[in-house]
């Protein structure tokens, strides 16, 4: 489960940016194409934050919808996978606009 190491990295990032203060909430953005399972992150969060500045902090996960733009017709549309064809023209040349995110968006500290 790579979500455990991802969650450990999230805790490290939060600790480094909290300035020694206790963290009460973490807002994490996870894109639909990131390959990260939000439920697994939630499961790992309590174990990874125990006895740290984040102990007892709330984890709020914001899902980021995957969006793409067709290189041929320039249509923008929701993606469910990397290789979805354009629904407007059927083209497979699609640029991902969003949905790959995995970032700490915000920290609440005391």
UniProtKB/Swiss-Prot annotation:
<dbReference type="GO" id="GO:0036211">
    <property type="term" value="P:protein modification process"/>
</dbReference>
<keyword id="KW-0862">Zinc</keyword>
<feature type="binding site">
    <location>
        <position position="73"/>
    </location>
    <ligand>
        <name>Zn(2+)</name>
    </ligand>
</feature>
<dbReference type="GO" id="GO:0008270">
    <property type="term" value="F:zinc ion binding"/>
</dbReference>
<keyword id="KW-0533">Nickel</keyword>
<comment type="similarity">
    <text>Belongs to the HypA/HybF family.</text>
</comment>
<dbReference type="GO" id="GO:0051604">
    <property type="term" value="P:protein maturation"/>
</dbReference>
<protein>
    <recommendedName>
        <fullName>Hydrogenase maturation factor HypA</fullName>
    </recommendedName>
</protein>
<feature type="binding site">
    <location>
        <position position="2"/>
    </location>
    <ligand>
        <name>Ni(2+)</name>
    </ligand>
</feature>
<dbReference type="InterPro" id="IPR000688">
    <property type="entry name" value="HypA/HybF"/>
</dbReference>
<comment type="function">
    <text>Involved in the maturation of [NiFe] hydrogenases. Required for nickel insertion into the metal center of the hydrogenase.</text>
</comment>
<dbReference type="InterPro" id="IPR020538">
    <property type="entry name" value="Hydgase_Ni_incorp_HypA/HybF_CS"/>
</dbReference>
<dbReference type="Pfam" id="PF01155">
    <property type="entry name" value="HypA"/>
</dbReference>
<keyword id="KW-0479">Metal-binding</keyword>
<dbReference type="GO" id="GO:0016151">
    <property type="term" value="F:nickel cation binding"/>
</dbReference>
<feature type="binding site">
    <location>
        <position position="86"/>
    </location>
    <ligand>
        <name>Zn(2+)</name>
    </ligand>
</feature>
<feature type="binding site">
    <location>
        <position position="70"/>
    </location>
    <ligand>
        <name>Zn(2+)</name>
    </ligand>
</feature>
<feature type="binding site">
    <location>
        <position position="89"/>
    </location>
    <ligand>
        <name>Zn(2+)</name>
    </ligand>
</feature>
